[in-house]
Structures are given as structure tokens and as C-alpha cells.
Amino acid sequence: MSQQAETTDIKKKILSTGIRVGTQVKTKFMRPFITKASPEGLYMLDLDITLDKIKTAAKFINRLGVENLIVCSGRQYAETPIEKFCETLGSKKLLGRFMPGTLTNPSLPYYIEPKLVLISDPQVDEQAITEATNAGIPVIGIANTDNITSNLDVIIPANNRGRKALATVYWLLVRQILIEKGELKEEDPMNIEIDDFETKITEEEIE
């Protein structure tokens, strides 16, 4: 299967996940990644750019080493995707509230020195971005149409609110990282599916 055909298959697989569905707001930072507005007034992201940026992020992560990456988010729906990502690749996860000084205060017991940070939402994960920037650590961020991305080194334009969309972004990242590492061929399926990355909601939470 050619790379173009494989890309087409991937696009078909992920279109229904809402990965390209943005919000009713667009910032000047995200304008280059937006293709149009839906009839409902939601700005739509360019899926080709998203896939290209995922490849860029995967190359960046592999160059610095998955073991030197921390993946963090205060967003609930990002927890399972991050856990699966880190379980598969061996990166470190930081979920929930990002404790001040984590990247900037060596005297704290939870201080760490990663070479790269991956965040799920520039607004929710602002503390992590600020500390990484102050410490000179590059940041990869998943950003929606309404996000400010001035302190991100690599922007992955995608829906960072939806459960399935977030699962898809992290699944795509794992897949591309494994391809870059030579552990998976472009045409081969992964043994983990998007559903494995998705945060599940219980009946109690729905009620």
C-alpha cells in the first residue's frame, strides 16, 4: 500500500471522531489551521495539516527520546489517552493539577527535568507551558480553534475537548512515533485501537 493510500485510509478511520471539529471562536494563532465554518457555526480544522503536525511532533519526540518526555493535562478526558500513550511508549505522565515548581524549583521533591513537554490544552495546561518556557523546555500542544498558542513550539491543531477526538490524537501520535522508531510499518495496523485510548463515562457520571 502506498503512503498516500495509507493516509487516505487513516483519514477515513478518524473523520467520524470529531478530531477536526473546533469551536465557535477562532484566534489569530489558529487561523492558518482553519478551513471553513460548519452550518452550526463551528470552525473546522484542516485534517491534512493536523496529520502533518502529528508527524512533526513524532519526529521531535523521537529525536529527544520518549523517555525524556512528560505528558500532562488537567483535562479529565485527556487522562486515559495520556495513560495509554505513556504505557505504550514509556513516557512520564502528570495528570490533574500541575503543581507549581514542578519544572522550575529543584528544591521540591516532585521537581523533574524533562527535555520535552506535551500538553492537551494551552488554556487548561497554562502552568505547565509557563514553567516549561521559563526552564527552556520545548512544548508540543494540542490546540483548538479558540486557543492561544504563542508559547508552543509545535502546534497540533485538533479538537481537544471531545473524548473520542483526544483519544484519536494520542492514538495517531503513538502510531507515528512507532513508525518513526521503525517498530511499525506505515501499512501495518496497530494492536491497540482508538477505543483503547478513550476515557469512558460511567452511568453515574451521565446522570
UniProtKB/Swiss-Prot annotation:
Superkingdom to which the source organism belongs: Archaea
Disulfide bonds: none
Pfam families for this protein: Ribosomal_S2
Entry's family note: Belongs to the universal ribosomal protein uS2 family.
Protein name: Small ribosomal subunit protein uS2
Gene that encodes the chain: rps2
Entry-linked PROSITE patterns: RIBOSOMAL_S2_2
InterPro entries cross-referenced by the UniProt entry: Ribosomal_uS2 (IPR001865), Ribosomal_uS2_arc (IPR023454), Ribosomal_uS2_CS (IPR018130), Ribosomal_uS2_euk/arc (IPR005707), Ribosomal_uS2_flav_dom_sf (IPR023591)
UniProt keyword Ribonucleoprotein present: yes
Organism per entry: Nitrosopumilus maritimus (strain SCM1)
Gene Ontology cellular component terms for the protein in this record: cytosolic small ribosomal subunit
Keywords per UniProt: Ribonucleoprotein, Ribosomal protein
Alphabetical GO biological process terms: ribosomal small subunit assembly; translation
GO molecular function, one term: structural constituent of ribosome
UniProt key word Ribosomal protein: yes
